[in-house]
């Protein structure tokens, strides 16, 4: 199938500016997607610079392969939660000048009804980031129970009508397996008062199911555990999130590593040990929101938050 999708990276200029790209630096774009950020990073890299991009979506890998003639560029097909493994394999652990994670879905994924992410276009109810692994959304919905579905919608969608929606989905599935996106969207829409929503009523539920079946929060937490081991002292960490669950996870991580650990009063400890404990591993630089102009041009930017931090030099 010919790919006619386009994708405008959110906060692109702000991202490149805060990465502060060095001519011969080493960078990781942990979410290649449609390649907008990677292509822009390559424009700023010198001939001796290196960019390692990661994506689990096979369609993104096909797009990335168009850049394979650029000797500075390396594409890795896999989950960004394995970022430490990839860094070790490429012998760049502790040498990376900047890591970027854009946690938003690409237009390529949303606008292709065959991927099953859209609640306004009909397609198979899939929702897998990598269609070759895991179970599709329709299969999980068929196997799950009311309690689990309710908790997923409540936790990952923050959906106020989770109980009623979960009940109606389970009840419908007992009569007929839900296999299409618009089929699910209609069940959700019929479950709640339309006047309660300014946006599409199925938005939160689709988000919750997608996050759950792709283990998105777990994947993010795993990646965050390793970034400090990968960055060079002074290296930048940029994370672009699009909903509160992601942003809370990122914010919690940055705050945790930007403060020295708690030392109980009266604990027997040497001055050297105390100085070592006082070292903060991360410095929070800023958080950036898209401008009104950008949101007008690119509506998907409205919920974006770019958080920027820098690994401290404690040596």
UniProtKB/Swiss-Prot annotation:
Its EC number is 2.1.1.199. InterPro entries: RsmH, SAM-dep_MeTrfase_MraW_recog, SAM-dependent_MTases_sf. It is an enzyme of class 2 (transferase). GO terms for cellular component: cytoplasm. Keywords: Cytoplasm, Methyltransferase, rRNA processing, S-adenosyl-L-methionine, Transferase. It is found in: Cytoplasm. GO terms for biological process: rRNA base methylation. Transmembrane segments: none annotated. One of its GO terms (molecular function) is rRNA (cytosine-N4-)-methyltransferase activity. It catalyses: cytidine(1402) in 16S rRNA + S-adenosyl-L-methionine = N(4)-methylcytidine(1402) in 16S rRNA + S-adenosyl-L-homocysteine + H(+). Disulfide bonds: none annotated. S-adenosyl-L-methionine binds at residues 35-37, 55, 80, 102, 109. The keyword Lipoprotein does not apply. NCBIfam families: 16S rRNA (cytosine(1402)-N(4))-methyltransferase RsmH (TIGR00006). PANTHER family: 12S RRNA N4-METHYLCYTIDINE METHYLTRANSFERASE, S-ADENOSYL-METHYLTRANSFERASE MRAW. Specifically methylates the N4 position of cytidine in position 1402 (C1402) of 16S rRNA. Belongs to the methyltransferase superfamily. RsmH family. This is Ribosomal RNA small subunit methyltransferase H. It comes from Buchnera aphidicola subsp. Baizongia pistaciae (strain Bp). The lineage of its organism: Bacteria, Pseudomonadati, Pseudomonadota, Gammaproteobacteria, Enterobacterales. The gene is rsmH.
